[in-house]
C-alpha cells in the first residue's frame, strides 16, 4: 500500500499521476486555493452552501499547514473559525483581455464568470479561453490517464518538486472531475464547492448560478481502507480515517501537549486554554466552544427531540443519547475493563471505572482541595460552596445544583420508574438503583476493604466504610460546626436547623424530613405487614423491624458501648446512649433554651409550651402528649401486664418499666451526676437532678408563669389551676391531687 501520509501522495490518486508544468514551479499559498466571493454573490448562497464552503476552506488550509506550505493565518480562516461570515469585497480589476489575467488574483472568480449578472461572453472568446486555460487538455490528460506501474509512479515522485503552484487554470470542470474524481481536494479548491463554468467547444452559452455550482456532486467512493473496507470519496478523508487504526495524532497542543488526529479538534481544544467561546445562544447568552454544542444546547429552549427510540418511543435531543439508550434494550456493553473484566454500555462510565483501578482524580476543588475523577463532579461539588442551585422544579419550586439530582426529583412527581428488574419485576426510577438491586439476587460483593477485608456490593458503600478507618469527616455544618462523614448526612442534618420537610404523604398530607421516613409511613396506609415473627406471630412492615424484634426472643445485643461496656439490641440505642458520656445535646428549644440529645425528645418537650396532646384514648377520651403515654394508659383498660419480674412476680405493662423495676432488686444505678457523683436508676431522674446544680427551671406554667426544675412538679402544680384530682379512694370515693395525699388518707380507713 502506498504511503498516504506523505505530502506527495496527494498527487497520486486512483492511478493518475499529476506531472508538474511550468506554471507549477512557484510555491503554493492559501490564495491559490481559496475561492473569493463578493457580497452579492455570498448573499445568494443558502446556509447549506455556506457551510460547505466553510468546511472545505478550513480543510484546505489545514492541509497546507500540515505540509508546511502556510505559516500565517489569513483573516478569512479566523472569521470561519469564529463562526462569522466572511464578506469579501468584489475585486475592481477589469476582466476581458488576456493581460487582465496576469494582474487579477488567480483564485478570484467574478460575477461575469459565474453568470450572476446574466450576461453571456462571446462564444469565440469563451472557446479560445477554455482551450487555453483548460488544464485537462488532450496532452495533459494523456499524461494523467496513464495508469503507470509502481516504478513509473515512483519515478514521477522523484521528479516532482516539493513546492508546486496550483492556479485557477488547474481546476477541472465538473465533466472532467467525473473522469478524474480522485484528484486530491486537500491541495485544490473543492470540486464540490465551486467549479469552473462548464463550457465545451460545442456549447455556445451556459447560464449557471452560484447555487447550482455549489450543489454537492455525488461522486464515486474509490478511496478504500485496507483495514476495515470503508470507502471514501476523497483520499484526504481516507488519510484521516486511517488514523483511527494507526492511532496517529499529528496535531499537538502547545499548552498541554495533548494530541489530536484532526486539526479541527485541536482548534476546538485550544479554546479551552484561551476561554474563547465564539458560539453564543440567542436565548440565554451562554457561550460554547463548538457549533454542534450550541445546536444541542438550543434544543433545551425549543424542546426539540429529533432522535426517537424505535423500541419504546422515547425521544432524545442528542443522537449519542439515543445510541446509549438503545443499549438498554439490546443489552450491549461494548466497553470492557482489562483489569477486572467488567463491561459497560457507555464509554464515559468505562473511563470513570478505570479511574478506580488507577486512583486518578485529576480535578481538584480550590476551596477544600477535594479531588474528583470527573470535571462534572467537580462542578457540582463547587456549588456546595457557592450555594448555587440552577435547576428548579416547576412542580414544587425546589431547586437543585445538578441536572441528575433534578431529574431524579422530577420522577417523584411523575411516578416514572422506567428500569425494571427481570428477576422480580421491581421497578426503579434510576438505572443505578436497578444495578444495585440486581446484586441482591446475585449476592455479588466485588468491593473489598483493604483494612478489614469486609466486602460490599457497591463502590460507594466501600468509600463510606473506609471513613470509619480514617475518621474522615469532610462535611461540616455552617450553623453549628458539626462534621459528618457523608454529604447526605450533612444534608439531612441541615433540616434540623431549617425545619425543612420536603417529603409529603399524598394520602394524609403528613410531611417528613427524610424519604425513608415517608416510605415507612406510607405503609401504615396500606397496612402491608409482610414480615412475620415465627416465635410470636407478630408482623412487621419492614424486614429490618422484624430482625430487631427477633432480638427480644434471642436476647442478642450486638451493639456495645466502648466507654462503659453496656450492650444494646439496636444501633440507634447505642448512639443515644453515647450522648450520656459526651454530654452532647444538639437539639435546643427556642422557647426556654433547654437542650436534648434526641430530636424526638425536643418535639415532645415543645408540647409542654404549646399544651398539645395529640394522642387520645378511644375508650375514655383522655389525651396525652406522648404516644408511649397513651399506650401505657390503654393497658389500664385491658389490664394487660405481660412483663413479669422473676424476683417478686410483679407484672408490668412495658418492658422498660420491668427493666427499671429490676434495678430495685439489683441496686443498679447506672446514671451518675458529674457534679456530685450521685447515682440514679433512671436517666430522667439524673436529668432532673442536674437542674439543681445549674438552677435551671425549664418548665413554665402557662397560667401563672411559675417555673419548675422538674416536669413532675409542673404537672402537680397545674392541678391547682385545673382543680384536677386524679387519685381517688376506692373506699369512700374522695379524690386527691397527689398520690402521696391518697396514701396518707387510705391509712385512716380501718384495715389499711
From Swiss-Prot:
SUPFAM superfamilies: beta-beta-alpha zinc fingers, KRAB domain (Kruppel-associated box). The keyword Transferase does not apply. One of its GO terms (biological process) is regulation of transcription by RNA polymerase II. InterPro entries: KRAB, KRAB_dom_sf, Krueppel_C2H2_ZnFinger, Znf_C2H2_sf, Znf_C2H2_type. It is found in: Nucleus. There is a cross-link at residue 207 (Glycyl lysine isopeptide (Lys-Gly) (interchain with G-Cter in SUMO2)). Keywords: DNA-binding, Isopeptide bond, Metal-binding, Nucleus, Phosphoprotein, Repeat, Transcription, Transcription regulation, Ubl conjugation, Zinc, Zinc-finger. The keyword Ubl conjugation applies. SMART domains: KRAB, ZnF_BED, ZnF_C2H2. GO terms for cellular component: nucleus. The modification Phosphoserine is found at residues 117, 122, 200. PROSITE patterns: KRAB, ZINC_FINGER_C2H2_1, ZINC_FINGER_C2H2_2. One of its GO terms (molecular function) is RNA polymerase II cis-regulatory region sequence-specific DNA binding. It holds the Pfam family zf-C2H2. Residues 28-99 form the KRAB domain. A zinc finger (C2H2-type) spans 223-245, 251-273, 279-301, 307-329, 335-357, 363-385, 391-413, 419-441, 447-469, 475-497, 503-525, 531-553, 559-581, 587-609, 615-637, 643-665, 671-693, 699-721, 727-749. PANTHER family: IP01015P-RELATED. Belongs to the krueppel C2H2-type zinc-finger protein family. May be involved in transcriptional regulation. This is Zinc finger protein 184. It comes from Bos taurus.
